[in-house]
Amino acid sequence: MNIRVWGTSLLMFLSTVTAVGQTANRYLKAPLPQDWEESGEVFQQILPVDDHWWKSFQDTKLDSLIALAVDRNYSVAMAINRIAAARANLWIERSNFFPSIGLNAGWTRQETSGNTSSLPQTTDHYYDASLSMSWELDIFGSIRKRVKAQKENFAASKEEYTGVMVSLAAEVASAYINLRELQQELEVVKKNSASQEEVLKITEVRYNTGLVAKLDVAQAKSVLYSTKASIPQLEAGINQYITTLAVLLGMYPQDIRPVLESSGTLPDYMEPIGVGMPVDLLLRRPDVRSAELSVNAQAALLGASKADWLPKVFLKGSFGYAARDLKDLTKSKSMTYEIAPSLNWTIFNGGQLVNATRLAKAQLDEAINQFNQTVLTAVQETDNAMNSYRNSIKQIVALREVRNQGIETLNFHWNFINRDFRLSKTYLMHNVLCYLMRISWYRHKVVRFATDSPLQGFRGWLERIKINL
């Protein structure tokens, strides 16, 4: 990965965090490392406090793009939908704490058979209205544990939302920085192409006057066409990142293209990054927190499945009125009620309870393994991003030296040409063309070096993004 992607990653991962779970450590099958493999002056043993990490770019356009993405991105909308669904599931389970009450009203006409008893055949009718109630008393905690599981799932959905927001900001920033890099590279290539066209014109004039061979013209054309050949690829890359940003912003490319077609710059940013300690940092990542909460939910469901082995106690009852004549329905003599506590204990159901418990246990084990896998992946991603960011800083420093040396070489050649003006005109024209060819090459390199430093700064920012994921 290049330097751009790793730098900004680090900043994001550190910033978008939540409180550390108290139960996380008991699920870890291997203790977290006490320190990062990467340490030193580039990283600090502190945790970041700013969730809006992208504001460090000091780019108002990027700020507005991320704000727009938060409002319009469909992944964010779906994450919000999942939170709403998890909240609804929580209230569905909570409703089991309360009695179920129903209202009944009706008119009944019945006729008894005269051939089933010694009584004559009779016809009767009556009106009735009543309230009925059924209430499961959660004595052994089955309902309570299922409510706890839904609480954990609800919390996990919020962590997933946080993770979506982190990823969205990272993807927008990465695409934006890559776009800016390609736009600057395109400007450099176009400038080089213009200078190479000038050299080609001069070379053709010299060829027509017999001062140079046709090989010189062919070489000048080869350099020019090679430079021009890279332009379509850069333009295609620019279009690709514009369409990527359009999708992230929930828009069509034509709606956002006018805003992004003009090139821009980002500041060169190489200050130390606060990463804290692994035990503090990793357990605060949204993906790690979500995995931990999923373990808690499965543990609660296992407890609920075990509680299903125990008796269930119900309290049932009804209160109402019944009378043959509608006018007598509300009289005290028409009042009826029923109270019927009951106990229901399943002692055999073909192994359903046993296998339900086995299923819950297997799902808990799977969630624990997923949690440990998530932690290991988080350690790997963070270490890789930190290593890449450190090497990116070294690369930036080296490229700056190359740029400085290129500028010195260019200045030397210009000064040398200026001194040649003291020579004869014929000798001057011959050497000026030679130097123009060489200066064109050096100009290409120096302009490239001059832009490489900010481009590498872009890469450094993108590396910081990955450390924060």
Label each residue range with its predicted role:
Residues 1-28:
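Bacterial Sec-dependent N-terminal signal peptides
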Residues 20-89, 266-296, 346, 375, ...:
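Bacterial Sec-pathway N-terminal export signals of envelope proteins
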Residues 22-23, 243-244, 253, 267-269, ...:
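Acidic, low-complexity, intrinsically disordered peripheral segments
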Residues 29, 143, 152, 158-277, ...:
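Periplasmic alpha-helical coiled-coil/stalk elements that build and connect Gram-negative outer-membrane
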Residues 38-58, 67, 105-132, 255-274, ...:
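Small/polar, glycine/serine/threonine/aspartate-rich low-complexity segments that form flexible
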Residues 62-64, 85, 126-128, 174, ...:
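Transmembrane beta-barrel architecture of outer-membrane proteins
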Residues 77, 97-121, 134-163, 182, ...:
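Small/polar (Gly/Ser/Thr/Ala-rich) solvent-exposed segments
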Residues 78-93, 164, 170-190, 198, ...:
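Amphipathic alpha-helical coiled-coil segments
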